[in-house]
Amino acid sequence: IDEIIPISFRNHFYASTGRTRKYPLHAFLWALIIQRIFSIPTDQLLLTFLAYSKSLREFCGFTKVPDASKITRFKQDFLDDLQLVFDNLVDVTEPICQAIDSAKADMTIFDSSGIEAFVTENNPKYANRIIKQLKAYAKAQGFDKSYDPYKAAYGSMPSHASANPEIKQLYINGHFCYVFKFGIVTNGLGIIRHISFYNKNFMASHPDIVVEKKSDSPDEDKCVHDSKLLIPTLKDFFSKHPLINPKTFLGDAAFDTAQLYKSLLTGDTFGNDKHFSKAYIPLNARSGLENLDYSINEDGIPCCPHDPSLQMKYEGTSKLHSGVTRYKFVCPRMKWIYDKSTQKSHRHCFCDNPCTSSKCGRMVYIYPEKDLRAYPGTIRGTEKWDDTYKIRTVVERDINHIKDNLCLAGRRTQNEKTLHADLILAGITQLITVVLADKINRHEYIRSIKPLIA
């Protein structure tokens, strides 16, 4: 573990001023990492294990078990140093990820979630009481079935916890909660590459983010907020790790906005001519695609002018001499006919109601750079799209993993620094798993440390 601790962390911990440290730096780090490896839910239970296990104390480097306050103070006082440890591990694990699967390592996936704080508003009875009152009110007033008490409850609940205005209301996994919001960037292997904690410091460093008042739709609010956080989060990621240069972005429909496609796929958004080549983002159902000459389906594929339900066939991608990429689509009724006399094949359209006089049938050329939203460097609705987009779920599994298995959920505190440190420690634990799996050549366990230590 000494190899991953920056010298600045050591200098800060063993400062020349102040009292002499009774407990070594590596002992605190090992104890907190082991807590997450074995999914020990509370710091107090960790200290109990240390008190009754001499071998565990010796492994960590403790000669005496510290108080619970020492653990808390360590997290709060050395939060920035823990962030440095995490950032160092990201750089250490990048070559490992590239060696395992370079295609997936070149993917960037983003999602956001929240750490539920220990506040009154997170008691299930709090939301249930409001919903019950609204249902009774709707019944008394004779409202019809279009009235949604859950949306009404969302609108009537406060936007932040009374104990701390930084603990914001959020709608996660089908329930209302009050959380410290964070964002996670992973690669296609599901290995965490970046963590952003959306507190006052983050907002101050990105003044271009405008926080709007909440609407009546919790899902819509989360989508709008996530789309505003994406580019600032990725800019922070690439500025910390300039040698990491992924080419493919995967995200959900919350990021389906014309401006985001332009930022992701063109220009100097993340550095000098540094941007993604492809963006796998499904179209938002609320806003489709339009074209005057022919209809376009929900995947951005042109359809027959006479039959919108009949999509044209994708025939390939080509590059012009100018370097411009174009996609070619042909009539779905077209077939290749072999001529024995010339020993060549030619196209022939067998449509009963042709939309063109050409014997080959209608052909459509799409230039992606003219409409990045419709054609973000790839074609929706194809087998390749479906296979690639499935990978996006690794970020959701990662979030569930760090919450359930790496001791992020159920923390009985509302202190921002403590919960932020817990989040970073969860990321550190996962990256140490990658290093350990690589050392013993068991890459199948890069996201599962328990089988490695069993």
Q: Where are the model-predicted features located?
A:
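Long, low-complexity, polar/charged, intrinsically disordered or flexibly structured peripheral segments
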Residues: 163, 327-381
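An internal, acidic/charged active-site-proximal segment
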Residues: 219-220, 226-339
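DNA-recognition alpha helix
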Residues: 43-60, 91-94
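Short amphipathic alpha-helical "interface-anchor" segments enriched in bulky aromatics
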Residues: 50-51, 114, 293-330, 368-416
